[in-house]
UniProtKB/Swiss-Prot annotation:
Recorded superkingdom: Eukaryota
One Pfam family this sequence matches: RDM
Name of the coding gene: RFPL2
Positions of RING-type zinc fingers: 101-143
Tissues expressing the protein: Seems to be expressed in prostate and less abundantly in adult brain, fetal liver, and fetal kidney.
N-terminal signal peptide: none
Residue span(s) of domain B30.2/SPRY: 168-362
PANTHER family: E3 UBIQUITIN-PROTEIN LIGASE TRIM
An MF annotation (GO) of this entry: ubiquitin protein ligase activity
Keywords: Metal-binding, Zinc, Zinc-finger
Any one GO CC term of the record: cytoplasm
Annotated protein name in UniProt: Ret finger protein-like 2
Source organism of the structure: Homo sapiens
GO biological process: innate immune response; regulation of gene expression
Length: 378
């Protein structure tokens, strides 16, 4: 079905508004057909080589941030295989992501399109300067350089961001953790063979905290020897998987997934480039996703129980407040070329915080496990 058949003007922003309404109302087929194409067109508006008013042709050099036709076809094929409920969440997240500034993480205000196709708020432009008062801007997403005199105001994206902001309450409701995700919950345990020697693990392999005394464990190739972290089991190669971690009163933690092949020796750096897709709590309440650079996150309340949903087919990993169901963050383009493992790192601040990370029992198990207490160790 073409947009013209419904009597709507065939412009990227009007298509996206129609898609957004379709997502909110539950009409998936129509929304799925247009949403990726619409958002890519809007993001490209104002990039050199495209007429920001009448469209026109792109230059023969496609900006690296813009999806190619092959990329769009692949995303569309993946969406076709999803259930309506899952697609609705994916589409809502895509709209929210497309209308957010990668610098300040807020809704775009007076968005400016860089040469690579990314858009940032006008007020955030100066923060991308490579040098003080310089003319070169370094994109925080693509690491490509744009000249100040080449950036353009993206008015279509500005109108769309304003429209999405008005519908934020409905989008938030869609992005809440769907209870049906729990049908993919896994009976996860901690892999003691990967645990740093300063970690204390409960006998049931479900709770972990940092200790001050080094444990006498066997020196194994899979063990983290410097960074205080641990992996979970099982390993994931396909399918969808959900688990929850009780972070309690911990003041610092890292949770997520990583490639099975990540380096275990020496001090590790948690970045997506090195195979870690994690959310971190630092400085008594600062939440961030370990992108490059960091993506700072804002939640309505302190997280105490974190839900993690891994979709190997869609190459996504999403984080939720498992108590309220609120969406926290979604990593996209998560590598599925090798097995992924759950990743946990409890707090190790100088004040000796005894924060415990506990894997929550399966919702239908009817049992609970006490977290490890000070003095207990494996």
């Amino acid at each position: 079905m073409e947009v013209a058949e419904l009597g709507f003007p065939e412009t990227a922003v009007s298509q996206s508004r129609i898609c957004l309404c379709a997502v909110l109302c539950g009409h998936w087929d129509f929304a799925d057909m247009m949403v990726i194409r619409s958002l890519s067109l809007i993001r490209l508006e104002g990039v050199e080589g495209r007429d920001p008013v009448g469209g026109g042709n792109l230059t023969n050099k496609r900006p690296s941030c813009a999806p190619s036709p092959q990329d769009l076809s692949a995303q569309w094929k993946q969406l076709e295989d999803r259930g309506a409920s899952s697609r609705r969440v994916d589409m809502a997240a895509l709209f929210q992501e497309a209308s957010s500034c990668p610098v300040c993480s807020d809704y775009l205000e007076k968005p400016m399109s860089l040469e690579c196709g990314c858009a940032v708020c006008l007020k955030c432009i100066n923060s991308l300067q490579k040098e003080p008062h310089g003319e070169d801007l370094l994109c925080c997403c693509s690491s490509m350089v744009s000249r100040k005199n080449k950036i353009r105001r993206n008015r279509q994206l500005e109108r769309l961001a304003s429209h999405i902001k008005e519908l934020e309450p409905k989008l938030k409701k869609i992005l809440q953790m769907n209870p049906r995700m729990r049908k993919f919950q896994v009976d996860m345990t901690l892999d003691a063979n990967t645990a740093n020697n300063f970690l204390l693990i409960s006998d049931d392999l479900r709770s972990v905290r940092s200790g001050r005394i080094r444990q006498n464990r066997q020196d194994l190739a899979e063990r983290f020897d410097v960074s205080v972290c641990i992996l979970g089991s099982p390993r994931f190669t396909c399918g969808r998987h959900c688990w929850e971690v009780d972070v309690g009163t911990s003041t610092e933690w890292d949770l997520g997934v990583c490639r099975e092949s990540v380096h275990r020796k020496g001090r590790i750096q948690l970045t997506t480039e090195l195979g870690f897709w994690t959310v971190s709590l630092r400085d008594g309440g600062r939440l961030s996703a370990t992108t490059v650079p960091l993506t700072f996150l804002f939640v309505d309340r302190k997280l105490q129980r974190v839900g993690i949903f891994l979709d190997m087919g869609m190459q996504n990993v999403s984080f939720f407040d498992a108590e309220s169901g609120s969406h926290v963050y979604t990593f996209r383009s998560v590598s599925a070329e090798e097995p992924l493992r759950p990743f946990l790192a409890p707090s190790v601040p100088p004040n000796g915080d005894q924060g415990v990370l506990s894997i929550c029992p399966l919702m239908n198990s009817g049992t609970t496990d006490a977290p490890v207490r000070p003095g207990e160790a494996k």
